[in-house]
From Swiss-Prot:
This is Mannan endo-1,4-beta-mannosidase. It comes from Bacillus subtilis. Homodimer. It holds the Pfam family Glyco_hydro_26. Residues 1-24 form the signal peptide. The active site is at E191 (proton donor), E290 (nucleophile). Its main location: secreted. Its EC number is 3.2.1.78. PROSITE patterns: GH26 (PS51764). It catalyses: Random hydrolysis of (1->4)-beta-D-mannosidic linkages in mannans, galactomannans and glucomannans. SUPFAM superfamilies: (Trans)glycosidases (SSF51445). One of its GO terms (cellular component) is extracellular region.
Length: 360
């Protein structure tokens, strides 16, 4: 094993209390009332690209809560690479389920695993394949009209009340993590520039300015509810359009609502991913918030992906690969990805007591 937690902790002991700031510029979360640990992680993450090595956090998707979520993906990666991902993802929203109560599509039983992961040196990402409030449940891929979208945003309608019920249960799950001091990369309403989720576009690369405005209103509504109504001060907000569609920045709700901009990127050639410069133009830390191969599945070489990050996307702060057949463990180059000198793994960012120092 090329990297050992003991080495990292030795550096912590040497530099704690004496580490100078990486620059005079401190990067704060968009929530001014964020808890101190969340502030520390945000500033630390934002300055990762200034390092010469240990600068890109690895990440993996663990599955949908109470359906496919488990620690299997971590175990597969550890067996393949000797390392565990720095970031582990869970999705609270099982938006395809047809249930008697739309809130039954939300589940956060993965929290116990996420809390344990945090305490052992990891960082969780929570995403949402959100059920469609235009219907009693399910239908997360059912297109809706702009009129239906407006009804969802209106708290006096049946649709609006369904949305509020969904948000309340999601917030309950995030509150459990807050109460344990867990900072969360929170990624709602992803891939909005695609035509496959109800909150996004309805046609392939067909721009709809009204739709874009409605999306922004929905995103801000979720932000205000989580931050102001529920007091969730442990969230870092991730905005991640699809790399293979246009209008990546058009849906951007504004710099006051987003901490990290990323891409959901599935590709055959990691050197030809679209949207990197567009995301950088938003002046936020950048990540591949969801990623994996779209071709050569089972034989894709993840060594090429980390090399592409180094050569073409050097401002990347983290990547999160999908699971099952798209996982590095099911393809080639997993060890090259996790053992690369640029890659940060579990235990190398957070030890349950203090962040590793930022050393130039």
């Amino acid at each position: 094993m090329l990297k050992k937690l003991a080495v990292c902790l030795s550096i912590v002991l040497l530099l704690l209390g004496a580490a100078s700031p990486i620059s005079a510029h401190t990067v704060y979360p968009v929530n001014p009332n964020a808890q101190q640990t969340t502030k520390d992680i945000m500033n630390w993450l934002a300055h990762l690209p200034n390092r010469s090595e240990n600068r890109v956090m690895s990440g993996a998707f663990g599955g949908y809560s109470d359906v496919t979520f488990s620690m299997t993906e971590e175990n597969r990666l550890k067996n393949a690479t000797g390392q565990s991902p720095a970031i582990y993802g869970c999705d609270y929203g099982r938006g395809w389920l047809e249930t008697a109560d739309i809130t039954d599509t939300i589940d956060y039983c993965c929290n116990s695993s996420l809390i344990s992961y945090w305490k052992s040196g990891g960082l969780p990402q929570v995403s949402l394949h959100l059920a469609n409030p235009a219907f009693p449940s399910g239908n997360y891929k059912t297109a809706i009209s702009n009129s239906q979208y407006k009804n969802i945003l209106d708290p006096s309608t049946v649709e609006g009340k369904r949305l509020e019920a969904l948000l309340s249960k999601i917030a309950d799950g995030l509150t459990q993590l807050k109460n344990q001091g867990v900072t969360v990369l929170f990624r709602p309403l992803h891939e909005m520039n695609g035509e496959w989720f109800w909150w996004g576009l309805t046609g392939y690369n067909q721009k709809d300015n009204e739709r874009i405005s409605l999306y922004k209103e929905l995103y801000k509504k979720i932000y205000r509810y989580m931050t102001e109504t529920r007091g969730l001060d442990n969230l870092l907000w991730v905005y991640s359009p699809d790399a293979n569609r246009d209008f990546k920045t058009d849906f951007y709700p504004g710099s006051s609502y987003v901490d990290i901009t990323g891409l959901d990127a599935y590709f055959t050639d990691p050197y030809a991913i679209s949207g990197y410069d567009e995301m950088l133009s938003l002046k936020k830390p950048f990540a591949f918030a969801e990623t994996g191969p779209s071709g050569n599945i089972g034989s894709f070489d993840y060594a090429a992906f980390i090399n592409a990050i180094r050569q073409k996307y050097p401002q990347t702060t983290y990547f999160l690969t999908w699971d099952e057949q798209l996982s590095p463990a099911a393809n080639q180059g997993a060890q090259s990805l996790y053992q690369n000198s640029w890659t940060l793994n579990k235990g190398e960012i957070w030890n349950g007591g203090s962040l590793t120092p930022i050393a130039e």
